[in-house]
Amino acid sequence: MKLVFSSDWHGDVITQGVDRYDEVEEGVMESVKHAIAINADVYFFGGDLCDPHTARAHRSVMLAHRVAYVLDAAGIPSYWLVGNHDVIEDGSGGHTLMSLGWSPGAVMPDPQWFTVGTHRDFINVVALPFTPTSRSYDPVEFIEGLEIDNDSPILVIGHLNLKGICAGSETLDMPRGREVFWPTDAIKAKFPRAIMVGGHYHERQTYDGVRIIGSTARLTYGEGHHKVGYLELEI
Protein backbone atom coordinates (compact mmCIF):
# COMPACT_ATOMS: atom_id res chain seq x y z
CA MET A 1 0.00 0.00 0.00
CA LYS A 2 1.18 3.51 -0.83
CA LEU A 3 0.99 5.97 2.05
CA VAL A 4 1.60 9.73 2.07
CA PHE A 5 2.22 11.64 5.31
CA SER A 6 2.14 15.39 5.95
CA SER A 7 2.47 17.06 9.32
CA ASP A 8 2.98 20.17 11.41
CA TRP A 9 1.39 22.69 9.10
CA HIS A 10 1.05 25.46 11.71
CA GLY A 11 -0.98 27.46 9.24
CA ASP A 12 -1.33 30.36 11.67
CA VAL A 13 2.40 30.90 12.15
CA ILE A 14 4.03 34.32 11.76
CA THR A 15 7.81 34.64 11.40
CA GLN A 16 9.22 38.04 12.36
CA GLY A 17 5.91 39.67 11.46
CA VAL A 18 5.55 37.80 8.15
CA ASP A 19 2.41 35.71 7.68
CA ARG A 20 3.47 32.28 6.37
CA TYR A 21 0.08 30.86 5.39
CA ASP A 22 0.60 31.05 1.61
CA GLU A 23 3.86 29.10 1.85
CA VAL A 24 2.28 26.49 4.10
CA GLU A 25 -0.70 26.13 1.78
CA GLU A 26 1.59 25.62 -1.21
CA GLY A 27 3.53 22.89 0.59
CA VAL A 28 0.38 21.16 1.75
CA MET A 29 -1.17 21.09 -1.70
CA GLU A 30 2.07 19.66 -3.12
CA SER A 31 1.61 16.68 -0.82
CA VAL A 32 -1.98 16.30 -1.99
CA LYS A 33 -1.00 16.50 -5.66
CA HIS A 34 1.66 13.84 -5.07
CA ALA A 35 -0.79 11.55 -3.29
CA ILE A 36 -3.15 11.77 -6.24
CA ALA A 37 -0.35 11.39 -8.81
CA ILE A 38 0.87 8.11 -7.30
CA ASN A 39 -2.67 6.89 -6.59
CA ALA A 40 -1.94 6.64 -2.88
CA ASP A 41 -4.07 4.32 -0.80
CA VAL A 42 -4.12 6.53 2.30
CA TYR A 43 -3.14 10.08 3.32
CA PHE A 44 -2.13 10.76 6.92
CA PHE A 45 -1.90 14.10 8.72
CA GLY A 46 0.48 13.89 11.69
CA GLY A 47 -0.88 16.73 13.83
CA ASP A 48 -0.47 20.45 14.57
CA LEU A 49 -2.85 22.15 12.19
CA CYS A 50 -2.81 25.42 14.15
CA ASP A 51 -3.29 26.93 17.58
CA PRO A 52 -7.01 27.22 18.41
CA HIS A 53 -6.92 30.74 19.85
CA THR A 54 -5.40 32.73 16.97
CA ALA A 55 -7.38 35.03 14.70
CA ARG A 56 -5.89 33.14 11.74
CA ALA A 57 -7.00 29.64 12.78
CA HIS A 58 -10.02 29.66 10.44
CA ARG A 59 -7.77 29.59 7.37
CA SER A 60 -6.03 26.44 8.57
CA VAL A 61 -9.36 24.75 9.24
CA MET A 62 -10.52 25.75 5.77
CA LEU A 63 -7.33 24.27 4.30
CA ALA A 64 -7.86 20.99 6.15
CA HIS A 65 -11.40 20.71 4.75
CA ARG A 66 -10.12 21.49 1.27
CA VAL A 67 -7.48 18.77 1.50
CA ALA A 68 -9.97 16.21 2.79
CA TYR A 69 -12.44 17.10 0.01
CA VAL A 70 -9.87 16.93 -2.81
CA LEU A 71 -8.49 13.62 -1.55
CA ASP A 72 -11.95 12.12 -1.16
CA ALA A 73 -12.84 13.17 -4.70
CA ALA A 74 -9.75 11.23 -5.84
CA GLY A 75 -10.80 8.18 -3.84
CA ILE A 76 -8.12 8.61 -1.15
CA PRO A 77 -9.21 8.44 2.51
CA SER A 78 -7.47 10.76 4.95
CA TYR A 79 -6.69 10.21 8.62
CA TRP A 80 -6.03 13.21 10.85
CA LEU A 81 -4.14 13.08 14.14
CA VAL A 82 -4.54 15.77 16.76
CA GLY A 83 -1.31 17.48 17.86
CA ASN A 84 -0.34 19.42 20.96
CA HIS A 85 -1.03 22.73 19.21
CA ASP A 86 -4.53 21.62 18.20
CA VAL A 87 -6.05 20.83 21.59
CA ILE A 88 -8.35 23.15 23.52
CA GLU A 89 -7.64 22.89 27.23
CA ASP A 90 -11.00 24.05 28.59
CA GLY A 91 -12.23 20.67 29.80
CA SER A 92 -14.37 20.08 26.71
CA GLY A 93 -11.89 17.79 24.97
CA GLY A 94 -12.13 19.89 21.82
CA HIS A 95 -9.52 20.62 19.17
CA THR A 96 -9.04 22.49 15.90
CA LEU A 97 -9.78 19.43 13.75
CA MET A 98 -13.25 18.72 15.14
CA SER A 99 -15.21 20.04 12.17
CA LEU A 100 -13.45 17.57 9.86
CA GLY A 101 -15.92 15.02 11.15
CA TRP A 102 -18.30 16.50 8.58
CA SER A 103 -15.87 16.14 5.68
CA PRO A 104 -16.31 13.06 3.48
CA GLY A 105 -13.43 10.63 3.64
CA ALA A 106 -11.83 12.26 6.70
CA VAL A 107 -11.31 10.30 9.92
CA MET A 108 -9.89 11.61 13.21
CA PRO A 109 -8.87 8.56 15.22
CA ASP A 110 -8.77 8.52 19.00
CA PRO A 111 -6.00 6.45 20.56
CA GLN A 112 -7.02 3.25 18.81
CA TRP A 113 -6.17 0.35 16.53
CA PHE A 114 -7.90 0.08 13.17
CA THR A 115 -7.24 -1.29 9.70
CA VAL A 116 -7.11 0.45 6.34
CA GLY A 117 -7.42 -1.23 2.95
CA THR A 118 -9.32 -4.36 2.00
CA HIS A 119 -9.51 -7.79 3.64
CA ARG A 120 -6.84 -8.98 1.19
CA ASP A 121 -4.59 -5.93 1.15
CA PHE A 122 -4.58 -4.05 4.43
CA ILE A 123 -2.40 -2.64 7.18
CA ASN A 124 -3.04 -2.35 10.89
CA VAL A 125 -2.79 1.24 12.08
CA VAL A 126 -2.25 2.23 15.69
CA ALA A 127 -2.96 5.91 16.31
CA LEU A 128 -1.30 7.75 19.20
CA PRO A 129 -2.60 11.33 18.99
CA PHE A 130 -1.98 14.07 21.51
CA THR A 131 -5.08 14.57 23.64
CA PRO A 132 -6.36 17.30 25.94
CA THR A 133 -5.67 16.73 29.62
CA SER A 134 -9.34 15.90 30.14
CA ARG A 135 -8.97 12.92 27.78
CA SER A 136 -5.43 11.84 28.60
CA TYR A 137 -4.28 8.23 28.24
CA ASP A 138 -1.19 6.18 29.02
CA PRO A 139 0.51 5.26 25.71
CA VAL A 140 2.45 2.37 27.27
CA GLU A 141 -0.66 0.80 28.80
CA PHE A 142 -2.51 1.32 25.54
CA ILE A 143 0.15 -0.50 23.48
CA GLU A 144 0.49 -3.33 25.99
CA GLY A 145 -3.27 -3.89 25.86
CA LEU A 146 -3.37 -4.41 22.08
CA GLU A 147 -3.62 -7.84 20.47
CA ILE A 148 -2.48 -7.60 16.84
CA ASP A 149 -1.13 -10.39 14.64
CA ASN A 150 2.60 -9.77 14.29
CA ASP A 151 2.57 -11.48 10.91
CA SER A 152 0.46 -8.67 9.46
CA PRO A 153 1.83 -5.19 8.64
CA ILE A 154 1.59 -2.70 11.50
CA LEU A 155 1.96 1.09 11.31
CA VAL A 156 2.10 3.16 14.48
CA ILE A 157 1.58 6.87 13.89
CA GLY A 158 1.73 9.38 16.71
CA HIS A 159 2.15 12.97 17.77
CA LEU A 160 4.12 12.53 20.98
CA ASN A 161 7.49 13.44 22.48
CA LEU A 162 10.63 11.34 22.07
CA LYS A 163 12.95 10.96 25.04
CA GLY A 164 16.47 12.17 24.36
CA ILE A 165 15.88 13.74 20.95
CA CYS A 166 17.64 17.04 20.26
CA ALA A 167 15.06 19.76 20.88
CA GLY A 168 14.23 21.91 17.88
CA SER A 169 12.03 24.93 17.22
CA GLU A 170 8.91 22.90 18.05
CA THR A 171 10.20 22.84 21.64
CA LEU A 172 12.37 25.96 21.92
CA ASP A 173 10.45 28.52 19.84
CA MET A 174 6.91 27.09 19.61
CA PRO A 175 6.25 25.16 22.84
CA ARG A 176 2.69 24.29 23.86
CA GLY A 177 1.19 21.91 26.37
CA ARG A 178 2.58 19.05 28.42
CA GLU A 179 5.00 16.28 27.46
CA VAL A 180 3.59 12.87 26.58
CA PHE A 181 6.19 10.37 25.42
CA TRP A 182 6.28 7.78 22.66
CA PRO A 183 6.06 4.20 24.02
CA THR A 184 8.90 3.09 21.75
CA ASP A 185 10.20 0.38 24.08
CA ALA A 186 6.73 -1.11 24.48
CA ILE A 187 6.14 -1.06 20.72
CA LYS A 188 9.48 -2.71 19.95
CA ALA A 189 8.86 -5.41 22.56
CA LYS A 190 5.32 -6.26 21.50
CA PHE A 191 5.39 -5.48 17.78
CA PRO A 192 9.05 -5.74 16.69
CA ARG A 193 8.23 -5.38 12.98
CA ALA A 194 6.02 -2.32 13.37
CA ILE A 195 6.81 0.81 11.39
CA MET A 196 6.67 3.96 13.53
CA VAL A 197 5.96 7.38 12.02
CA GLY A 198 5.71 10.60 14.01
CA GLY A 199 4.69 14.21 13.86
CA HIS A 200 5.49 17.02 16.33
CA TYR A 201 9.16 17.48 15.41
CA HIS A 202 9.85 19.85 12.52
CA GLU A 203 13.12 18.36 11.29
CA ARG A 204 12.82 15.22 9.18
CA GLN A 205 14.88 12.47 10.76
CA THR A 206 14.69 8.99 12.22
CA TYR A 207 15.12 8.74 15.97
CA ASP A 208 14.74 5.65 18.17
CA GLY A 209 13.10 3.88 15.26
CA VAL A 210 10.50 6.61 14.65
CA ARG A 211 10.47 8.20 11.21
CA ILE A 212 9.72 11.88 11.71
CA ILE A 213 7.60 13.40 8.94
CA GLY A 214 8.84 16.96 9.46
CA SER A 215 7.01 20.21 8.84
CA THR A 216 5.66 21.31 5.49
CA ALA A 217 7.53 24.65 5.59
CA ARG A 218 10.52 26.19 7.37
CA LEU A 219 8.68 27.95 10.17
CA THR A 220 11.53 29.73 11.98
CA TYR A 221 15.00 30.98 11.10
CA GLY A 222 16.43 28.02 12.99
CA GLU A 223 14.80 25.67 10.49
CA GLY A 224 16.68 27.02 7.48
CA HIS A 225 18.59 23.75 7.02
CA HIS A 226 15.54 21.51 7.33
CA LYS A 227 14.28 19.33 4.51
CA VAL A 228 10.58 20.08 4.33
CA GLY A 229 7.69 18.53 2.45
CA TYR A 230 5.95 15.19 2.85
CA LEU A 231 6.86 11.57 3.50
CA GLU A 232 5.97 8.64 1.25
CA LEU A 233 6.09 5.00 2.34
CA GLU A 234 5.05 1.77 0.67
CA ILE A 235 4.09 -1.06 2.99
Description of each model-found segment:
Residues M1-V4:
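Extreme N-terminal starter segment of soluble prokaryotic enzymes
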Residues D8, G47-D48, G83-N84, H159, ...:
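Active-site glycine-centered loops adjacent to acidic/histidine catalytic or metal-binding residues
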Residues W9, V13-T118, I187-R193:
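Core catalytic region of metal-dependent phosphoesterases/phosphodiesterases
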Residues A35-N39, A74, L146-S152, E232-E234:
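Glycine-rich phosphate-binding loop signature in dinucleotide/nucleotide-binding domains
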Residues V42, P77-Y79, P153-L155, A194-I195, ...:
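Proline-centered loop/turn at the N-terminus of a beta-strand
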Residues T115-G117, N124, E232-E234:
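Short, well-ordered beta-strand micro-motif
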Residues H119-A186:
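Binuclear metal-dependent hydrolase catalytic cores centered on His/Asp/Glu-rich metal-binding motifs
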Residues K163, G168-E234:
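Conserved beta-sheet core of the metallophosphoesterase superfamily
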